[in-house]
Amino acid sequence: MRFIIFLSSFAVDNYLSVMSKRIIVAITLVLFLCTGCEWKIKPSIGETETGSSIKVERYDRLQSRYLTTGDFSALQQMSINYPMETRTLIEDILKLGQVNDPEINKRMLNFYQDSTLQTLISDAEAQYANMDDINNDLTTAFKRLKKWIPNLKVPMFYAQISTLDQSIIVSDEAVGISLDKYLGKDYPLYAKYYSEEQRSSMTRNNILPDCLSFYLLSQFPIKGFDSCSQIERDYHFGKIQWVVNKVLEKNFFNGEFVSAVDHYMQDHKTETYSQLLENHDYKRFLR
């Protein structure tokens, strides 16, 4: 079994913009599927550890082919090449039923015939026809992270189109990027559902920080999230954001908790990033 963390639109946007707001996460247990009859070889975890480049798997293109034209071969590739991603999409994001239901594929196709969703698919595929910049940025980022946190696994990344519900989906082996949540702060449809503050983080430039933040959060979770205080959560998220700033080589995230972590690390230069993220004594950040 593996854990998959779904990060809701409001959780992602609020986390990135205001540290004092809560992140809402729903954790779902998902069963492994047999992948022995794959049509192609997917990149394995840790591939970048050997020097290879990260390349976002274009699951979204198969989605687009099936959901806009009913192309059965695209559906077959979704099921065979990406069984876990397809199950997660159907059962846990769209909540359409069980993936082995004989009618599930027809149900999914009909669900996406909504004119708004068809527009999202078309616009996402147009904006993200090329993702070379994101591939390069992810490769550079994880090479830096591996130097600082050698035991960190390098996940497989894939793109998908959901329904504006989720931005990033994280498991122990993969990170899913919902392209429909990154169409730009001025994307017309967003104004109907999101505040200006939320829309400011729904851009292409936020994909890399989001991926890094939430993957690190999954690998270094806060202990006793439900029972710990809000200040403890804020400091924990501040640590994650501070590390992401270092990876990005710029202060993408700001705020009092990131600043507190920065002051602490300046005074404790021998402390490793792993030690920083694994230590849950938040009193040490108080000055």
PLM feature segments, named:
Residues 3-10:
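Hydrophobic alpha-helical signal peptides and transmembrane signal-/tail-anchor segments
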Residues 38-106:
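N-terminal mature-domain "stem" immediately C-terminal to a signal peptide or N-terminal signal-anchor/transmembrane
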Residues 33-36:
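C-terminal motif of bacterial Sec signal peptides marking the signal peptidase cleavage site
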Residues 107-278, 284-287:
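Acidic/His-rich structured neighborhood in mature extracellular/periplasmic domains
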Residues 13-15:
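Intrinsic-disorder-associated, low-complexity terminal segments enriched in Asp/Asn/His/Tyr and depleted
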Residues 2, 21-27:
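Sec-dependent signal peptide recognition
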